[in-house]
Amino acid sequence: MVVNKIDWVELKVLKNEPDIFFRILPEEWQKTIGPVWEDCKENGCIYVLRNAAEIMAGGIVFIEEPPNRTQFEIENGAPYLALGYYYIGFLFVGPNYRNQSMGSKWLEAIKNKYPDRSFWLTIEEEGLRYFYEKNGFKCVAESQDPSTPEWMFVYTSDQKGFKIV
């Protein structure tokens, strides 16, 4: 089922009900974040876009180190963490709301929530590059290991998109 009209959307914080968001995630993602959430919930905040009926999209903003970082994220993310960039992880759009700009609306809502903040994130699917680039993120690093491809993106609040060398 594809929902064509969205009348009302709200950005909501899920402080005490993380499972509501975790349940919409792919099973692999649930296994990654679920077991460690208790240990990192003070460092992360779940934001969801919802209408009156359900969660349409959501993600987690980490103000410090995200959990379960890969070696690529550890090495390349350190300078951004040191500069106070927030990490965006687990951005997911529900199947009924895909191709309706919900991911872009979620990112825009987060940028509006933190107007003076810069962000970083990583992707493991190259097909997502265009999505993040059209939302103002710049690719600043690419893993050299073909068995575990990853790309790091940054969004700077001043829109300069510089690369830390």
Where are these regions (language model features)?
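Conserved GNAT-fold acetyl-CoA-binding loop/helix
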Residues: V13-E38
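Conserved N-terminal entry element of GNAT/NAT acetyltransferase domains
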Residues: M1-F22, K163-V165
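Conserved acetyl-CoA-binding loop-helix of GNAT-fold acetyltransferases
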Residues: F90-V93, N99-N112, K134
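Long, low-complexity, intrinsically disordered N-terminal extensions of eukaryotic proteins, enriched
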Residues: G84-Y87, G161-V165
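Charged, low-complexity C-terminal accessory regions
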Residues: S147-I164
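Conserved GNAT acetyl-CoA-binding A-motif
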Residues: N112-E125
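Conserved active-site alpha-helix within GNAT-family acetyltransferase domains
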Residues: E125-P149
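Conserved acyl-donor/pantetheine-binding loop and adjacent beta-alpha core of acyl/acetyltransferases
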Residues: E28, P35-F90, R98, P146-W151
